[in-house]
Regions:
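Tandem repeat scaffolds
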Residues: 5-182
């Protein structure tokens, strides 16, 4: 699969490279926050880009490469990230409510304090991820690979974990006792 380069992408008539440069300056107090709401970033090479705090609501990132990207506090509400490569990204406090992450490669991702309400992680690769203190109500993890995932301090009672092997997952305190007593 061939990925699209940043310089070839546009959103609302602006080159993506210009939007990202302004976003970098935003953190220094002189630019503007990247608003990529509804952007078509499918199959894009976004590896190692800084999208911390960016707005990507309902954006299409299917099949994109986001490996090593900086994504803390980004808003991916309703975004399509199916088959995206998110390995080793920091998504601390990002919002992925209602996002589609089916079959995403997300090993090593930091989902600390993320809003994952109603996110779809079906058949995603989620090895060595940190879901600590994340909100996962209504999230679907059916068939996901969650080996060595951290779910401590996370209320998983309203998440769908059907078909997930949790034998190596660090679970919330008392999870096994609650499950056995149910």
């Amino acid at each position: 699969m061939r990925l699209r380069k940043l310089k070839s992408l546009k959103h609302n008539g602006k080159r993506l490279t210009e939007i990202l440069e302004a976003h970098e300056r935003f953190w220094k107090g002189t630019g503007t926050r990247a608003d990529l709401t509804g952007a078509d970033l499918s199959k894009a090479d976004l590896s190692k880009v800084n999208l911390a705090g960016a707005i990507l609501r309902n954006a299409n990132l299917e099949g994109s490469d986001l490996r090593g990207a900086r994504l803390p506090g980004a808003d991916f509400t309703g975004a399509r990230l199916r088959k995206a490569d998110l390995r080793n990204t920091d998504m601390t406090e990002a919002s992925l409510a209602g996002a589609d992450l089916r079959e995403a490669q997300a090993s090593g991702v930091e989902f600390f304090r993320c809003d994952l309400t109603n996110a779809n992680f079906q058949k995603a690769l989620l090895r060595n991820v940190n879901f600590r203190d994340a909100h996962v109500d209504g999230a679907k993890f059916t068939g996901a690979n969650m080996g060595i995932a951290i779910l401590r301090e996370t209320d998983i009672s309203k998440a769908d974990l059907t078909g997930v092997d949790l034998s190596t997952t660090l679970m919330p305190a008392g999870y096994g006792a609650k499950k056995q007593g149910a």
